[in-house]
A protein has these predicted regions:
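Minor-groove-contacting beta-hairpin "wing" of winged helix-turn-helix DNA-binding domains
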Residues: 133-136
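Single conserved hydrophobic/aromatic residue that forms the stacking wall/gate
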Residues: 202-212
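N-terminal Rossmann-like or analogous alpha/beta NTP/dinucleotide-binding catalytic cores
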Residues: 1-127, 144, 152, 158, ...
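Nucleotide/pyrophosphate-binding catalytic subdomain
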Residues: 130
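Short, histidine-centered active-site or binding-site loop motifs used for metal coordination
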Residues: 19-23, 179, 208
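Anionic group-transfer/hydrolysis microenvironments
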Residues: 60, 138, 178
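NTP-handling and nucleic-acid-processing catalytic cores
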Residues: 1-2, 141-191, 198-201
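Short, surface-exposed connector motifs at secondary-structure boundaries
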Residues: 96-100, 185, 208
Length: 212
């Protein structure tokens, strides 16, 4: 983006906002509170301008950290995430934050996530390895558009741990194949779970509204 054009207004009265929600492996901290308050200010300001606000804030309730934490505490991942999710809801309420229009969980959107990964595979943007399915960042020209960086710069400075089969070290997991005794769901690629970066796909009953 050039930062040379002033964005005067939204093209329609309806404003759709996606907010990356919490990964619920531990209680909320001040960073979560800051994010909630900043976006709550934005929501209220847009409502003041007369805009119809549609807000999607996901809850990531399956993740490597969640699995690790549940094993540490000797509880199931679902018990852990249920309790921590309640703490987040209570924290948002204590901060007097407006509730989002949609607040779905990863585990409630497995079918939608799988369908979208299939589409990315068909477009040759996603590929399978022995550990899961990954997003090829070199196949999407707008991947770093907001950061102002280039793919070449990103790859030249990468410090991500190498995973066998990945085309680029910075490619991220869309679907992770499950290890022994890990929670998992059936998929065309084998038993596994969604990758952390796929969270946008479970933002609403119509995820495409937020992925266009």
């Amino acid at each position: 983006l050039t930062k040379s054009e002033e964005i005067a207004d939204f093209p329609s009265n309806e404003v759709k906002i996606y907010l990356c929600g919490p990964t619920v492996q531990s209680p909320p901290h001040i960073g979560h509170g800051r994010s909630a308050v900043v976006f709550d200010f934005l929501f209220r300001y847009l409502k003041y301008l007369g805009k119809e606000i549609i807000v999607a804030r996901n809850i990531t309730d399956i993740d490597d950290k969640i699995i690790e934490k549940s094993l540490e505490q000797g509880v199931t991942y679902s018990e852990l995430t249920k309790n921590v999710s309640k703490e987040f809801i209570q924290a948002y309420a204590a901060l007097n934050c407006l509730k989002p229009t949609y607040e779905p969980k990863a585990t409630e959107s497995i079918d939608e996530i799988i369908d979208f990964i299939k589409i990315l595979e068909e477009k040759d943007i996603a590929y399978q390895t022995s550990s899961g399915v990954y997003f090829d960042i070199t196949r999407y020209s707008k991947y770093l558009e907001l950061s102002g960086r280039s793919i070449e710069d990103l790859l030249s400075g990468t410090r991500v741990e190498f995973i066998e089969g990945k085309k680029n070290n910075e490619d991220f997991a869309l679907w992770k194949l499950a290890k022994e005794n890990e929670p998992s769901w059936k998929s065309p690629w084998g038993q596994g779970r969604p990758g952390w970066h796929i969270c946008l796909l479970y933002t609403s009953p119509s995820p495409r509204d937020f992925t266009e």
